[in-house]
Amino acid sequence: GAYTTADVKVVKGNGWTVNDQRPATPGYKEKKNNEVMQSITNVINHLKVDIENQRLEISFAGDLIAASGVGASAAQCTSLARALNETFNLNLDDEKINEAAYEGEKAYHGTPSGIDNTASTYGGLIWFVRNLGTGKNTMDLLQSPRKMLIAIANSGITASTTEVVADVRRLREENPEKFEKIFGEYRKLVEAAKKALLKGDIATIGNLMNKNHKMLQQITVSGETNDELVEISLENGAIGAKLTGTGRGGLVIGLAENEATQEKIVNVIEKKGYSAWRTTIG
């Protein structure tokens, strides 16, 4: 897998500075700059780190490409929480790291679900259920008997998660019955996907990915480039393909049956002028 790393040095002075050396989609860092700054402030404040009597020099690096849809913001928040924990010997367990990262994610999402920071904190294949009340979210680590070969396509477009979420919320308020029906189908789809993952049934997983993408189109989360990349993936052998993350840009993932197909999808997408890479899930 790919990672974001963070390093914190303590020097004389007060406040903090940041040096962001992460590889990124062109324009991503510029568009997300205000959110990055606020997320750092959120994490520092949550962990009650003193910046009145000392100055923090924060740096981010790693091989995870910062792009919409890959969980880059969560990786940044989680890596910062871990670096602060190490630098100041805060003795935080993963649950506390996750809580700090969630506070950072609020700068990007307004009201984040918590899934991205949870995936970033714990890693692996995760079953996540958000608690819509005041209780805790549910998180289980799953084991699939089969590795999932994924081709990731980058649209090169950076969308604002906050704006997309606000648009969808407005549409839901305008047409609650339509959205309740879609969300009901969504719940069934996710339960079916969990069963298929536990069996390693990639044919079913691929079919469910395709259905999921159609739902995302219905709620206006997908964009033209997302749809184009989904079609390219399917035309070149993907069992299933869908956007991932914010949508209206960002990334598309395609599920391949074997490494040769995975390679083919990536190569064709690159020939079309987009960046693409390979990963494995499970």
State what each model feature region is:
Residues 55-57:
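Residues at or immediately flanking beta-strands
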Residues 66-68:
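Helix-loop-helix module between adjacent transmembrane segments
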Residues 94-95:
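A sequence/structural signal of beta-propeller blade repeats
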Residues 247-249:
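Glycine-rich nucleotide-binding loop
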